[in-house]
């Protein structure tokens, strides 16, 4: 305002100066000067008044503007005061987001590290697996080669086991052989007793045809006189025949024991000739047609002599020797006709699997007349017809032992 007033005064002064410079010719008159000064004051006053109005308008506009700015400032302060809680939440959210980003970066780094470790471990495991597969393949090939070598060359342990089993079998066979020897000794003693107490063989040959028809009726009756002697002599012949068979069995068992011992010593390499001999001996013992039984302790007669029953024969007395020869010849033919497949030796059922249990011994009996081998004869084995059956039986036993 002061500047404006000063400007107005200056303007007045300039006007005055300008007016003073433009002196009119009538300036000498005092009335004209008063009119001019009055006119200048009026114009100056009007100009000042006009300027004052303008300044008042401007001042009111500025006040309005200041008031509006003050209102805006107050509103901004109120907004700032009200938005302080939101800012805190925004700050918290920002800090949380920053922490989450940091955790994400850490997890990414850990994941990369773990994936790298896993790839390395997987690579190492695959290499180990390949090595193990190669080792397993090598072990399989080694096992297969060892199995092939074992099949070709069995180890000593298997031979030892086989040797032990063979020794056990040999021990069992030796025990059976001892039992058979005891049986043979008992039978020999009984035969000697029967030979001492029995009558002559010629009387038995004369009385056999007369006594045989009466045998079925006297089966359960004690025998006396020539009938009893005939039965005793017949039992003697049967025992002699079975003794020959037992002797053959013992010879074959001894042969088998020797073969088993040689097989165990030679690592179970069985010779072809031994197998053929064993099959031949087993064929000799294959007496499938014979089923006669002999009791170890026969009942005694009232006179203190052992009684024995023999089945009746349908052949006449004059053909008795020929029938016995045919029996022996049929045995030899059956022995030769028996097939031999080279299998292991097996004892036949004809001589007593249960001999140690029921106190009895089962012997082979003569074949029946219905068999095909019955009646066949060979001149090189049969003795002269003048010899009694006992003598040619001994000769036949000797021939069998010689062949065995």
UniProtKB/Swiss-Prot annotation:
- GO-annotated biological processes: dendritic cell differentiation; dendritic cell proliferation; mitotic cell cycle; negative regulation of canonical NF-kappaB signal transduction; T cell activation
Q: Which residues carry this modification: Phosphoserine?
A: 330, 365
Pfam families named in the record: TBD (PF12845)
Source domain of life is Eukaryota
Residue spans making up a coiled coil are 40-198
Q: Does the keyword Signal apply?
A: no
The name on file for this protein is 5-azacytidine-induced protein 2
What is known about what this protein does? Adapter protein which binds TBK1 and IKBKE playing a role in antiviral innate immunity. Activates serine/threonine-protein kinase TBK1 and facilitates its oligomerization. Enhances the phosphorylation of NF-kappa-B p65 subunit RELA by TBK1. Promotes TBK1-induced as well as TNF-alpha or PMA-induced activation of NF-kappa-B. Participates in IFNB promoter activation via TICAM1.
Q: Among its keywords, does the record have NAD?
A: no
A Gene Ontology term for the protein's cellular component: cytoplasm
User: Whom does it interact with, and what assembly results?
Assistant: Homodimer. Interacts with IKBKE, TBK1 and TICAM1. Interacts with TAX1BP1. Interacts with CALCOCO2.
Q: From what organism does this protein derive?
A: Rattus norvegicus
Interaction with TBK1 and IKBKE: region residues: 229-269
Positions of the UniProt region annotated as Disordered: 332-351, 356-390
Instruction: Give positions of region: Homodimerization.
Output: 1-198
List locations, semicolon-separated: Cytoplasm
Which UniProt keywords are given for this protein, alphabetically ordered? Coiled coil, Cytoplasm, Phosphoprotein, Ubl conjugation
PTM text = Ubiquitinated via 'Lys-48'-linked polyubiquitination by TRIM38, leading to its degradation.
Q: What is the lineage of its organism?
A: Eukaryota, Metazoa, Chordata, Craniata, Vertebrata
């Amino acid at each position: 305002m002061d500047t404006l007033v000063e400007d107005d005064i200056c303007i007045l002064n300039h006007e005055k100066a300008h007016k003073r410079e433009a002196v009119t010719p009538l300036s000498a008159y005092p009335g004209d000067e008063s009119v001019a000064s009055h006119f200048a004051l009026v114009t100056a006053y009007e100009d000042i008044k006009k300027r004052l109005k303008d300044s008042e308008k401007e001042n009111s506009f500025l006040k309005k503007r200041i008031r509006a700015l003050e209102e805006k400032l107050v509103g901004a302060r109120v907004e700032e005061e009200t938005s302080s809680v939101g800012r805190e939440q925004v700050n918290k959210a920002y800090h949380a987001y920053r922490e989450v980003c940091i955790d994400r970066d850490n997890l990414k780094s850990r994941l990369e590290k773990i994936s790298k470790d896993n790839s390395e471990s997987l690579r190492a495991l695959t290499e180990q697996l390949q090595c193990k597969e190669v080792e397993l393949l090598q072990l399989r090939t080694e096992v297969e080669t060892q199995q092939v070598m074992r099949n070709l060359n069995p180890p000593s342990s298997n031979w030892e086991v086989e040797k032990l089993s063979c020794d056990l079998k040999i021990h069992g066979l030796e025990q059976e052989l001892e039992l058979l020897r005891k049986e043979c000794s008992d039978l020999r003693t009984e035969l000697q007793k029967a030979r001492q107490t029995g009558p002559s063989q010629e009387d038995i040959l004369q009385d056999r045809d007369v006594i045989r028809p009466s045998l079925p009726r006297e089966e359960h009756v004690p025998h006396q006189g020539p009938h009893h002697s005939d039965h005793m002599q017949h039992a003697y012949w049967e025992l002699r025949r079975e003794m020959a068979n037992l002797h053959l069995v013992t010879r074959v068992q001894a042969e088998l024991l020797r073969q088993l011992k040689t097989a165990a010593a030679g690592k179970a390499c069985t010779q072809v000739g031994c197998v053929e001999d064993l099959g031949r001996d087993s064929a000799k013992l294959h007496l499938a047609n014979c089923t006669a039984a002999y009791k170890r302790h026969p009942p005694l007669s009232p006179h203190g002599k052992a009684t024995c029953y023999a089945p009746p024969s349908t052949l006449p007395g004059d053909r008795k020797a020929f029938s016995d020869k045919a029996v022996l010849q049929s045995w030899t033919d059956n022995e030769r006709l028996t097939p031999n497949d080279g299998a292991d030796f097996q004892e036949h059922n004809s001589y007593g699997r249960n001999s140690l249990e029921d106190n009895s011994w089962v012997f082979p009996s003569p074949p029946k007349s219905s068999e095909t081998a019955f009646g066949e004869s060979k001149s090189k084995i049969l003795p002269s017809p003048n010899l009694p059956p006992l003598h040619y039986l001994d000769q036949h036993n000797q021939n069998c032992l010689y062949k065995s």
